[in-house]
């Protein structure tokens, strides 16, 4: 670029004027001294670095045009151009110079300040060092240093460590003694603390051993140093885990569980047509003979969970008993047992004992002693009925919890019904219907003055333990024998009634007399058969006469 | 879990506990020995005694921590025994024979409510067979 610029400059300098005299003069400059030419160019056009090729080309074009017009106009334009270029050059130079000078000044001032600081510090230190030997050097010390450091304080000397004293040994001994004393104290405090911890843990694990000896399963709790106990291992369907921990207030142990209720019991009531309670029974578990408070809590939780589970099972079963007249809500289950009476099943969650029993009317006070005895007997009977229903419900739920027993002993039931479905309400309804059907049959026979013998054979009568009792309550098929004496001179009719809890054959009546053997599916047909038999006998007796 | 894997896990657990016990015991003994070693000040200046003061305190704390570790091992052993040993029996409901008989009688009574019940006669079965013989 610089070479090109120089060439352009040479060209422009050559084309400044076309007069022979001027051209000749220029040639002389070239021949004589090239430096002078450069100086002249610089004087006329400024520094080389400011020259631009475009500007020079424009000038050449203008000069060619000017040559064609006139010399005066060309001189005027040249002057204007020079003036323009000069003004531009002046402006650029001023700006560049001003910027450079400002930056340079700033940098220079910073350097000078640093140097001044270093010189001042050197002067201070030098003056302070010489102040001991030369009095005039104090004058050159700065006021700040003079006020803080006394003169002649800077010397040519070495610092020595402090000499050992007799008290150093005593000091070290005191330090060590203090350390040992504090360590001894710390150890004694730790001993007391850990002894307390050991005692507490001893009590804790002693209680846990009692729980384990009572055959309750224990588990490690994640994220906790305490153990958990499963309190639903016997009769519950829910998991039933509770954390065993110490109460900080009373220093006793408790089982921390997440049960919804603090107390729960199944309650069975009998309502009359006016929905008044005429009999009730609230379940209560027998008290456990144990001295451990923790075990008592666990048994209580087990009972609560058991009652909650049995209630949930009853609700679940009630959903499939709608065709048998069972109605249920979230709070109660209603099982109709006659036109005027309903069995109500609820979960009692309050601690208040609401076992009211028989509801007495005002009129009962005016009854005679006979009526009073009757009412009392009825009350006791209703109470007994409710207690028995409650007991049977619990027994059947226990059987439901033993799934393996049911699966192994009654495989046909396992295939027929859902293994997880509870079977509590249906047996109760089944036995009630059996009672009503038998009662209806007896009434029909009595109306016709027919003698009979009712010989039931209930499955629980042969049970030797409670496990057999549980199984007997869920037996699918029963066998009840009847003996109907239609006449004093004719043989009796033997009837075998086999009601069925599950399956298609709900009730089968097998009738056998001296002439034939028949099978019926309903009591109505049996009654018709007996009537037909009686009519046949009467016709036969007439013929004989 | 198979018995082999259970045995391996049991051995590993035992080794871990033994190692913890050994480490804690060694820590207690070594720290106690260190405290006794630096307890004497003879031939030491105060600049040497000063750091030993802090060493004694650190060793003391280390001893206490080792004891706590031993307690933790004891706790683990107890918890392991309580949670992993099998029980030979399960909690059972306390029933008795009189209660069973009472329940049976009550069930029969309620089931036969308002019904006239007759005892089953052995002769009834023999009488039943008689018509069959006559038919023959």
Curated annotation (Swiss-Prot), chain A:
Q: Where in the cell is it found?
A: Nucleus
Q: Which GO terms describe its biological process?
A: positive regulation of transcription initiation by RNA polymerase II; regulation of transcription by RNA polymerase II; transcription initiation at RNA polymerase II promoter
Q: Which GO terms describe its molecular function?
A: transcription coactivator activity; transcription coregulator activity
Which InterPro entries would you find in this protein's record? Answer: Mediator_Med17
Where does it primarily localize? nucleus
Range of residues in the leader sequence: none
Q: Which GO terms describe its cellular component?
A: core mediator complex; mediator complex
Statement: the UniProt record of this protein carries the keyword Nucleotide-binding: no
Q: Which controlled-vocabulary keywords does the entry list?
A: Activator, Nucleus, Transcription, Transcription regulation
| Comp. bias intervals (Polar residues) | 149-162
Q: Where are the transmembrane segments?
A: none
| Start and end residues of each stretch annotated as Disordered | 148-168
Function summary: Component of the Mediator complex, a coactivator involved in the regulated transcription of nearly all RNA polymerase II-dependent genes. Mediator functions as a bridge to convey information from gene-specific regulatory proteins to the basal RNA polymerase II transcription machinery. Mediator is recruited to promoters by direct interactions with regulatory proteins and serves as a scaffold for the assembly of a functional preinitiation complex with RNA polymerase II and the general transcription factors.
Q: Which family does it belong to?
A: Belongs to the Mediator complex subunit 17 family.
Q: What is this protein called?
A: Mediator of RNA polymerase II transcription subunit 17
Which source organism does the UniProt entry give?
A: Schizosaccharomyces pombe (strain 972 / ATCC 24843)
Q: Which gene specifies this protein's sequence?
A: med17
From Swiss-Prot, chain B:
Q: Which one GO biological process term can you cite for this protein?
A: transcription initiation at RNA polymerase II promoter
Q: Where would you say this protein principally sits, based on its record?
A: nucleus
Q: Which family does it belong to?
A: Belongs to the Mediator complex subunit 22 family.
**Organism, per UniProt?**
Schizosaccharomyces pombe (strain 972 / ATCC 24843) (Fission yeast)
- InterPro entries xref list: Med22
As for subcellular location, the record says: Nucleus
Q: Which UniProt keywords apply?
A: Activator, Nucleus, Transcription, Transcription regulation
Highest taxon of the lineage: Eukaryota
Q: How does it assemble?
A: Component of the Mediator complex.
- Functional summary from the UniProt entry: Component of the Mediator complex, a coactivator involved in the regulated transcription of nearly all RNA polymerase II-dependent genes. Mediator functions as a bridge to convey information from gene-specific regulatory proteins to the basal RNA polymerase II transcription machinery. Mediator is recruited to promoters by direct interactions with regulatory proteins and serves as a scaffold for the assembly of a functional preinitiation complex with RNA polymerase II and the general transcription factors.
A Pfam family hit: Med22
- Lineage of source species: Eukaryota, Fungi, Dikarya, Ascomycota, Taphrinomycotina
GO molecular function terms listed in the Swiss-Prot or TrEMBL record: transcription coactivator activity
**Would you tell me the protein name for this molecule?**
Mediator of RNA polymerase II transcription subunit 22
Annotated Gene Ontology cellular components are:
mediator complex; nucleus
